[in-house]
Amino acid sequence: MNVHRTKLLGASAGVFLFAIIYGWVIFPKILRFMISKQVTLKPGTDIRDLWSNTPFPLHFYIYVFNVTNPDEVTAGGKPRLQEVGPFVFDEWKDKYDLEDDVQEDTVSFTMRNTFIFNQKETLPLTGEEELVIPHPIMQPGGIMVQREKAAMMELAAKGLSIVFPDAKAFIKGRFMDIFFRGMDVDCSSDEFSAKALCSVFYTGEVKQAKQVNQTHFLFSFLGQANHSDAGRFTVCRGVKNNKKLGMVVKFADEPELAIWPDGGECNNFVGTDSTVFPPGLKKEEGLWAFTPDLCRSLGAFYQRKSSYHGMPSMRYSLDLGDARADESLHCFCDDPEDLDTCPPKGTMNLAPCVNGPLIASMPHFYNADPKLVADVEGLNPNEKDHAVYIDFELMSGTPFQAAKRLQFNLDMEPVEGIEAMRGLPKLILPLFWVEEGVHLNKTFTNMVKYTLFLGLKINSGLRWLLIMLSFVGLGSAGFLFYQNSDSLDITLPPKIIKETNNKVADSNKPNEPPHFAADTSIPGTNPPNAKSEKRERY
């Protein structure tokens, strides 16, 4: 009986230890190993196919700030803004000219973004709405000449007056013309100042301009970026080291940028190309990606737990930080040694990146210096509409949903050399903001659900079942040991009564019945057996 109880106890303890070790140590390691072998950019894998040609479009929203009092602003007044949008586009991402380097475990490719107007989702807007915005060539051009080539201001002012006759600081145009179809730039004049101005169009320095013929160009914010080269990347494939999956090694065939001063950390590539992330990240590491539009790597950091279609995930968020307060961001200042040259909190100076007086921020200056909001009318920053967020599953490296939001602003200032710009106020004027959003549908979430989470649920159920069974076994063994100890027979030893020879002492004692020694035999009788007593348990 004791052998069975001992076996039951040992087996139960073994099951308990197995459930703990397998459920919390061995199985997660096996699962991570299996994921690491599947999630690579090796040719022929499902991940490679999904990564190179995204099988679904992202949602791309554009919101434009219509200036309702342009004449007042031209005279130095406070801008009043009206947000118009969203104008909705389907954004398709693909990668072409892929070249693998097996030895370095990298793949090089050219990124391409294609925007297709989604008229149905844009309703009631049509894209033909007339909007008033700062002149997209005169204002940036005049400001940059004043800052960097003041000696050429007279020549530039004359050229602008010829190429854009009767131009004002603000222009009116249709949304699709401003952003995609383009606004006409007439470079047909033989005047020297006009030719000098137009030379930057012919040389390709104005990347937003498309040459139509020998003398005319079309300028738009996004037209040239549509279905065209968005940069040449080299990233890690993650075959040799899964932790480096998607990490940017080169951009434009360069191992680092040469944009920011002092060759500091700001020129380094940190993170992926934003279309893939390595599996098995720790939440404290953050999600980093290089963004060519900003010439910068941005990191999103853990905020809280979240869920998507019933699957647990982690919510990450980001902002542009405060270059003055954060020493690691000092290299984004014009002069890292002079903090007065740093952009305001929550903004980033894009001039070194785009060669124009542009400032990046979160929409409506969310999480930025409150003065920026106070300088204009019509802004209402809030987390729900304007924060950047990502709901991310760490083990598989899957972003379930995300909203990448960014606002572009004009770093406006008066320009003495151009009559139409002399009275402008000095402030940061919002132009437009965009949102690039993704929400995985059931087809792709089910791939994660039935490969990852189903296995995790089975493992969780199995380990708790084994733990419960081990507790039942331990309890049963304990009960059997207890029951056995409760029925033990204990034989009491006989009492020995010694006879004394001290007569004097005995005479002083009261009369007592005679005592006989327990081991003394009475003639003619047999000694009785010692009685057994069952000890009662108290």
UniProtKB/Swiss-Prot annotation:
Coiled coil residues, start to end: none
Extracellular-side positions: 29-460
Glycosylation sites: N66, N213, N226, N441
Record region (Disordered): 501-538
Gene Ontology cellular component annotations, sorted alphabetically: cilium; cytoplasm; dendrite; neuronal cell body; plasma membrane
Location (main, coarse): membrane
Topological domain ranges for the Cytoplasmic compartment: 1-7, 482-538
Assigned keywords, A-Z: Cell membrane, Disulfide bond, Glycoprotein, Membrane, Olfaction, Receptor, Sensory transduction, Transmembrane, Transmembrane helix
InterPro entries cross-referenced by the UniProt entry: CD36_fam
Keyword Magnesium tagged: no
Superkingdom: Eukaryota
Topology relative to the membrane: Multi-pass membrane protein
UniProt key word Transmembrane: yes
Disulfide bonds: C266-C331, C295-C353, C333-C342
Transmembrane domains' residue ranges: 8-28, 461-481
Localisation: Cell membrane
GO function terms (MF aspect): scavenger receptor activity
GO biological process: cell surface receptor signaling pathway; cellular response to pheromone; detection of chemical stimulus involved in sensory perception of smell; lipid homeostasis; pupariation
Family to which the UniProt record says this protein belongs: Belongs to the CD36 family.
Function description: Plays an olfactory role that is not restricted to pheromone sensitivity.
Annotated protein name in UniProt: Sensory neuron membrane protein 1
Organism: Drosophila ananassae (Fruit fly)
